[in-house]
């Protein structure tokens, strides 16, 4: 591979070569995922770290967390454990984002695609909540959406995602994207307690550097990925169409979808309900055929399985999995 042949992974992270990779990765994200040029792009170890960075870099701020699944709940828990005032608002998995009167806060925290249950907050809902609360900053966990579907950038201020989902890269890195408003607030507050505090990281990111030794391999792979993929507007629509086909096909074959409201179904994570015994046998049979079905998560751990609908998955792979599921379903009836 070119990255190894050029010796990039053995370079010092302050070297000109690695800085150039960082810069090209940033330029690629701006070009292919339409990240605004005035948003700052940083690299961290994980989405979980991004939860911590937010809470620690804006210590004392008040956070409203609106969620319906395990990852949104965990994020709220991190904000609270780190000492910030938190208003946690849980809503039903088959309902759209609640149109409630929100308590006062500095931040509104949303999960774009909730990986644990396969729900989705549509772009128009994110746009509306920003319009209703223009004075607040909006944080968006885009772990199961960045690189697969469009992000309403102008309505978000702190967007982050691990790279192993829609971006299809090895785990061990996350992309963190800050609006000018979020960056200004972080620098204004000037909290530098932690090595990864934004007040420490943002000035270095402007120079395509980090406060720590980053995952150089993933940065280089991200750079290459951005150079080779289509723009997000050419990825989003086919992925949405493939998701709709999955949901329609599963319903036609008698599978029980966890999310009954198609308006809030995730385009990237399809979640199916079944008995615990059925899922045990299904996953065993799938493994024998070379398929890996995702485990359930949280309260649905033993009674659901999840199907990834990421850009790297081909139509032939979808068809092969559907043929397997059809055969298994017929044998169980």
What are these regions (language model features)?
Residues 25-36, 226-258, 284-285:
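Conserved PLP-dependent catalytic core of the aminotransferase class-I/II
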């Amino acid at each position: 591979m070119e990255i190894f042949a050029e010796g990039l992974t053995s370079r010092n992270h302050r070297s000109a070569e690695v800085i150039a990779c960082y810069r090209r990765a940033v330029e690629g994200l701006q070009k292919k995922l339409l990240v605004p040029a005035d948003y700052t792009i940083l690299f961290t170890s994980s989405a979980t770290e991004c939860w911590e960075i937010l809470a620690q870099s804006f210590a004392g701020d008040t956070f409203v967390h609106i969620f319906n699944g395990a990852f949104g709940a965990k994020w709220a828990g991190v904000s609270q454990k780190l000492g910030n005032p938190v208003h946690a608002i849980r809503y039903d998995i088959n309902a759209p984002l609640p149109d409630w009167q929100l308590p006062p806060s500095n931040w509104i925290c949303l999960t774009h695609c909730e990986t644990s249950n396969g729900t989705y907050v549509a772009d128009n809902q994110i746009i509306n909540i920003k319009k209703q609360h223009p004075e607040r900053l909006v944080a968006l966990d885009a772990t199961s959406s960045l690189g697969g579907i469009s992000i309403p950038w102008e309505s978000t201020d702190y967007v982050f995602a691990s790279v192993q989902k829609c971006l299809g890269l090895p785990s061990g890195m996350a992309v963190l994207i800050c609006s000018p408003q979020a960056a200004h607030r972080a620098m204004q507050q000037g909290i530098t307690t932690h090595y990864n505090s934004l007040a420490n990281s943002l000035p270095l990111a402007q120079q395509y550097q980090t406060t720590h030794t980053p995952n150089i391999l993933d940065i280089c792979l991200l750079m290459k990925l951005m150079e080779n993929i289509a723009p997000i507007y050419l990825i989003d629509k086919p992925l949405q169409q493939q998701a709709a086909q999955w949901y329609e096909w599963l319903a036609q074959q008698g599978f029980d979808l966890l999310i009954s409201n198609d308006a809030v179904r995730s385009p990237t994570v399809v979640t199916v309900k079944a008995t615990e015994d059925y899922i045990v046998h299904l996953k065993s049979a799938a493994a024998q055929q070379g398929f890996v079905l995702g485990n359930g998560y949280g309260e649905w751990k033993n009674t659901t399985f999840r199907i990834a609908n990421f850009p790297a998955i081909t139509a032939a792979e979808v068809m092969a999995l559907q043929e397997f599921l059809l055969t298994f379903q017929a044998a169980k009836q």
